[in-house]
Amino acid sequence: MNTSITARELFDQQRDKLALRWVAGQKGEHREIQAGSNNARRPSLAGYLNVIYPNKVQILGTEELAWLDSLDARQRWETIEKIIQVQPLALAISKNQSCPEDLRAAADESNTPLWISPKRGHELLNHLSYHLARTLAPRVTLHGVFMEIYSIGVLITGEAGSGKSELALELLSRGHRLVADDAPEFTQIAPDVLDGTCPELLQDLLEVRGLGVLNVRDMFGDTAVKKNKYLRLIVHLTRPMTEPTPSGYERLTGDSGSRHVLDLDVPLITLPVMPGRNLAVLTEAATRLHILRTKGIDPAAMFIARHSNLLERRTP
């Protein structure tokens, strides 16, 4: 999924938090950063003024403005031209410092957004860097029901009619929490972290065949819904009639594997859907088993080791 952010969107999203004022270059509100547009030669999306390897959002603190003031007229104008020529998304001045008139004029002439904030430079840097990195991070929408089960994020997947929503409803009645139904969005916010959220349109809603759309918050209370959760496990529901009979080894270890999501391999456990099986209990057990495995505890491996030791002792 391609993502981008314009200068206007960034300003509106951070205006209240950073008390931003737009003082010049208002016509540049449509300047845009696209996901994946950064390259190895650029230090970061947002950073202190860097003329050699410019950031997309250039922050001018006390030292940066003092450095500009220390230049002679020719050097100062050449430096301002370099800042403007690379077309940054925006320039941001910290601590409500006065904006130099030549910088303001250059920003207006080139339609370069110029903002002023009462926040200190490092506060601007931290907020803008985090917000841009999260907004432009790789993201994908997966079909399924995303829930918090025993404090970890579990995505329930399967074919249409496999019982995902009914399973989610049963898990909700057992005290677990819903993050998103049908189309959870996952963002890779770190090399090994996928953060799952719910689209605004589907917030708090769960669709169950025969019942229609249910408002989980109204039915089960505020504690039954969760704003976001890191994806740690996928439970896939499958119809065994179309699958081969599990081998003896699979009967010991279960049908487990992984699914590639963005740049990560997420652990996956497959549960056959058959009459009489309590899928809610099985899903809870699968989640507990995953938690044990992350701690290095594997019951199947323990059994195989015991069996091997027993055979060795009985071998003459």
Curated annotation (Swiss-Prot):
Annotated region described as Important for the catalytic mechanism of dephosphorylation, given as residue ranges: 272-277
GO biological process: regulation of carbohydrate metabolic process
N-terminal signal peptide: none
Entry keyword Lyase: no
Binding residue positions for Mg(2+): 165, 207
Important for the catalytic mechanism of both phosphorylation and dephosphorylation as annotated region, ranges: 206-215
Cofactor: Mg(2+)
Active-site residues, as the UniProt record annotates them: 143, 164, 182 (proton acceptor), 251
UniProt keywords, alphabetically: ATP-binding, Kinase, Magnesium, Metal-binding, Multifunctional enzyme, Nucleotide-binding, Serine/threonine-protein kinase, Transferase
Amino acids binding ATP: 158-165
Catalytic activity line of the entry: [HPr protein]-L-serine + ATP = [HPr protein]-O-phospho-L-serine + ADP + H(+); [HPr protein]-O-phospho-L-serine + phosphate + H(+) = [HPr protein]-L-serine + diphosphate
Origin: domain of life: Bacteria
GO molecular function, one term: protein serine/threonine/tyrosine kinase activity
GO cellular component entries: cytosol
Assigned protein family: Belongs to the HPrK/P family.
Comment text on domains: The Walker A ATP-binding motif also binds Pi and PPi.
Additional free-text comment from the UniProt record: Both phosphorylation and phosphorolysis are carried out by the same active site and suggest a common mechanism for both reactions.
Oligomeric form and interacting partners: Homohexamer.
Stated role: Catalyzes the ATP- as well as the pyrophosphate-dependent phosphorylation of a specific serine residue in HPr, a phosphocarrier protein of the phosphoenolpyruvate-dependent sugar phosphotransferase system (PTS). HprK/P also catalyzes the pyrophosphate-producing, inorganic phosphate-dependent dephosphorylation (phosphorolysis) of seryl-phosphorylated HPr (P-Ser-HPr).
Name of this chain's protein: HPr kinase/phosphorylase
